[in-house]
Swiss-Prot record:
Post-translational modification remark: Predicted to be exported by the Tat system. The position of the signal peptide cleavage has not been experimentally proven.
Keywords: 4Fe-4S, Electron transport, Iron, Iron-sulfur, Metal-binding, Molybdenum, Nitrate assimilation, Oxidoreductase, Periplasm, Signal, Transport
Residues binding substrate: F803
Gene name, Swiss-Prot/TrEMBL: napA
Protein name, as recorded: Periplasmic nitrate reductase
Residue stretches making up the 4Fe-4S Mo/W bis-MGD-type domain: 37-93
Family statement: Belongs to the prokaryotic molybdopterin-containing oxidoreductase family. NasA/NapA/NarB subfamily.
Length: 837
């Protein structure tokens, strides 16, 4: 059957309509003649919005992409990055063969990168990993993964590290972007991920953006908000940030606040709601508990830092070796105690602290307080990359819970994601150093036991100790605690904090062996010892999970160039190099004698569950190189085993094949029907008739409102370093620019990073627009041009620098302070000075 793009769209219209209702129908055949473009659906490779695209291939190459008009998320639209997806795989410097640092024919830490075979690459990885385990045990190994991994890549990595090598030293780069959202959800609701969905946009009367420049970072969702506002009189938009950006163009209530004072603003809103008698008392009485948390929790810096030495509840070892308190500890309080706690956050006090006018604070609070106004709160990195990021998430939930504006169309607190599968892979699969699939954690013995049973492993296989998180991994490499480190699908040497002091030294430490899997020679790759060339996006069969709990699949469309192989294949092949006796203690092997002599591949992947789907089940007319090389339908096997964790436990995923037929489905998918709103009767299958609202993540079915104070940041401007620095993204580039800077049109649109600065700050320093300047912190310095006009307009005393530019590494300047609960880095607040070169 031959289909052009128009015919393909028509043929799938019915499928899209039915799948939107949670049903599935057979997918259209899309086999093409040699001379025609073949079109097939995929999820966009960039942000967490999860736009649908149509991928056009011809002669083994992606030649075009289009917005998918049948995709519910974007309805045929793509942002500027999405329109150029067809070019991201074809940069001139695409890696096609493994590269090892060598000198005189041997590996040398200071040698030149030299092409080698995959066999030799795995030989040296095996040698270095085994030497590390012999010297340091399994915790000498670490892997840093990604919210860009496909679902099955993350799941395979989690099995390999946590069960195979028996270390929880696995963390995703989502630690840098979504960990605070995870911790916030778990503390307030006992279960992760948003209760609402994008359909909320078409029902809302007001939108509040907290530290989220949706106009540039989630532009397709922004078009839906814009349409809602311009098409419906009375719809309001409030925007809060530390500097003005493009989202302010639509704002009815624009607010610029002093960094960190969002905590105080959130408490003021709660106080306003209470003082004005706008608490939904019936909702609160039935559905909410109140708690007060530990507050002297430090800033996630090294234990020797002055800010950590005196902290009483940062969890670090005290002189007696015991942890100093618990960063997440909380105790019950009453509503009256909460009322008294927030009463100090008056409009006068908060206006003075934050710099936001009293009238704007009142207008914002009234949006939440008015029972007739449906409100969505959107946030991204402004909340999450915050030394009190977990608290910020909790405080926003407080407001929605006090008013009952939650879990129904148009009323939703909504944490947006920045990566295409930060939800689907990092969070749901559980590739964090403390997590297992379906919101389980490694410290819970019942969770470990359940996981071991599903994986067919002896009890005690999974260690009970939380592994190193992202920032701790860097410190462990520097300190010599980790000697073997494998990074896949991210560019942490550019994206991680405090590069000069905490990242680079560990990578170049002589005894450490660093492996980077990437399609391109990134900053990370060039700092590594071994580079593995990686297949990307539609060069493999994949699955992502977006910010609204929508799981989306795509088929392999083209082959990867040269010898490039997927992250999944790399994990599989590496696992074949180790027998259980080499990595497990004898007493563990003795519990399962049938596993003796088997490789980790045999035990984890060829285990009778993952390998039960045959090659003839893969899609006809499409390549599936991973499955062909491995010998069975690996993607289906991994997915179905993984899905067994969530089915019946509030994380239900549909059968594998249905995702290839639908434009994504939002979990929980029960009885073939997706869930749009969680926790409310009539929408959520886990809320029984008569229960109304039930936050079933907690055993008592209630959510928690937390009493949490405003606290200052870890570092603020002073006489020497007199300006705030905030980092982030721009519309044209994504993260570190690995893909977007290799698209000529995107590169030309914004070729180099600049320092956005208030004109008066520039003038006071004798600087002019376009002038080259030095921006320095206590940790490093970079040179770049001054920009006093354009899209980003900082207030006096603050500068903004995007992090996409490999030639201007802004993370040389940033501080490696984190939220002590979530361990997420604060990239939004440190002190710098700007001087003329």
């Amino acid at each position: 059957m031959k289909l052009n793009r128009r015919d393909f769209i028509k043929a799938n219209a019915a499928a899209a309509a039915i799948s939107a209702a949670g049903l599935s129908v057979p997918g259209a055949a899309v086999a093409q003649g040699k001379d025609e473009i073949r079109w097939d659906k995929a999820a966009c490779r960039f942000c967490g919005t999860g736009c649908g695209v149509l991928v056009g291939t011809q002669d083994g190459r992606v030649v075009a992409t289009q917005g998918d008009p049948d995709a519910p998320v974007n309805r045929g639209l793509n942002c500027i990055k999405g329109y150029f997806l067809s070019k991201i795989m074809y940069g001139a410097d695409r890696l096609k063969t493994p590269m090892l640092r060598m000198k005189d024919g041997k590996y040398d830490k200071n040698g030149e990168f030299t092409p080698i075979s995959w066999t030799k690459a795995f030989d040296i990885m095996e040698e270095k990993a085994k030497a590390t385990m012999k010297a340091k045990g399994p915790n000498g190994l670490a892997m840093f993964g990604s919210g860009q991994w496909t679902i099955w890549e993350g799941y395979a990595a989690s099995k390999l590290m946590k069960a195979g090598f028996r270390t929880n030293n696995l963390d995703p780069n989502a630690r840098h972007c979504m960990a605070s959202a995870v911790a916030g959800f778990m503390r307030t609701f006992g279960i992760d991920e948003p209760m609402g969905c994008y359909d909320d946009i078409e029902h809302a009367d007001a939108f509040v953006l907290w530290g989220s420049n949706m106009a540039e970072m989630h532009p397709i969702l922004w078009t839906r908000i814009t349409d809602r506002k311009l098409s419906n009189k009375g719809v309001k938009v409030a925007v809060l940030s530390t500097f003005e950006h493009r989202s302010y163009e639509l704002a009815d209530i624009p607010m610029i606040f002093t960094p960190q004072t969002d905590l105080a603003i959130l408490n003021y809103i709660a106080n306003y709601i209470i003082q004005n008698g706008k608490v939904n008392q019936a909702f609160v009485d039935k559905n909410v508990n109140f708690k007060k948390s530990a507050t002297d929790i430090g800033y996630g810096l090294r234990p020797t830092h002055a800010l950590e030495k005196n902290a009483t509840s940062n969890g670090y070892p005290d002189a007696d070796g015991k942890p100093k308190g618990d960063t997440g500890k909380s105790d019950p309080i009453t509503f009256d105690e909460f009322k008294k706690f927030v009463s100090e956050y008056t409009v006068e006090k908060v206006s003075k602290l934050s710099g936001v006018a009293e009238k704007d604070l009142k207008a914002l609070a009234e949006l939440y307080a008015d029972p007739k106004v449906k409100v969505i709160s959107f946030w991204t990195m402004g909340f999450n990359q915050h030394t009190r990021g977990t608290w910020a998430n909790n405080l926003c939930y407080n407001i929605h819970l006090l008013t009952g504006k939650i879990s129904e169309p148009g009323n939703s607190p909504f944490s947006l994601t920045g990566q295409p599968s930060a939800c689907g892979t990092a969070r749901e699969v559980g590739t964090f150093s403390h997590r297992l699939p379906a919101d389980m954690v490694v410290t819970n013995p019942e969770h470990r036991k359940h996981t071991e049973e599903l994986w067919g492993l002896p009890e005690g296989t999974i260690p009970d100790k939380v592994g190193y998180h992202a920032v701790a991994m860097a410190r462990a490499l520097k300190d010599g605690k980790v000697n073997f480190y494998w990074q896949q699908c991210n560019n942490n040497m550019q994206a991680g904090p405090n590069i000069n002091e905490e990242l680079y030294p560990g990578w170049r430490k002589p005894e450490n062996f660093i492996v980077v899997s990437d399609p391109y020679p990134t900053v990370s790759a060039m700092a590594a010892d071994l580079i593995l060339p990686t297949a990307m996006w539609v060069e493999k069969e994949g699955a992502y999970g977006n910010a609204e709990r929508r799981t989306q699949f795509w088929r392999q469309q083209v082959k990867a160039p040269g010898e490039a192989r997927s992250d999944l294949w790399q994990l599989m092949e590496f696992s074949k190099r180790f027998k259980v006796e080499e990595v497990w203690p004898a007493e563990l092997v003795a519990k399962a004698p049938k596993l003796k002599g088997k490789t980790l591949f045999d035990v984890l992947y060829a285990n009778g569950v993952v390998n039960k789907y045959k090659l003839n089940e893969t899609a006809a007319g499409f390549d599936n190189d991973d499955s062909k090389l491995i010998g069975f339908y690996i993607q289906k096997g991994l997915f179905e085993e993984y899905a067994s964790f969530g089915r019946g436990h509030g994380h239900d995923l549909a059968p594998f094949d249905s995702y290839h037929q639908a434009r994504g489905l939002r979990w929980p998918v029960v009885g073939g029907k997706e869930t749009l709103w969680r926790f409310r009767e009539g929408y959520d299958p886990y809320v029984k008739k008569g229960e109304g609202v039930k936050f079933y993540g907690h055993k008592d079915g209630k959510a928690v409102i937390f009493a949490l104070p405003y606290q200052p940041p870890a570092e603020s401007p002073d006489k020497e370093f007199d300006m705030w620095l905030s980092t982030g993204r721009v519309l044209e580039h994504w993260h570190t620019g690995t893909m977007t800077r290799r698209v000529p049109e995107l590169y030309k649109a914004f070729p180099d990073a600049v320092v956005f600065m208030h004109p008066d700050d520039a003038k006071a320093r004798g600087l002019q627009r376009g002038m080259e300047v030095k921006v320095a912190s206590r940790r490093g310095e970079i040179q770049l041009r001054v920009e006093t006009r354009g899209r980003n307009k900082p207030p006096r005393g603050l500068v903004f620098i995007p992090f996409f530019d490999a030639g201007r590494l802004v993370n040389k300047l940033t501080l490696d302070a984190t939220c002590p609960i979530s361990k997420e880095t604060d990239y939004k607040k440190c002190a710098v000075k700007v001087t003329k070169v």
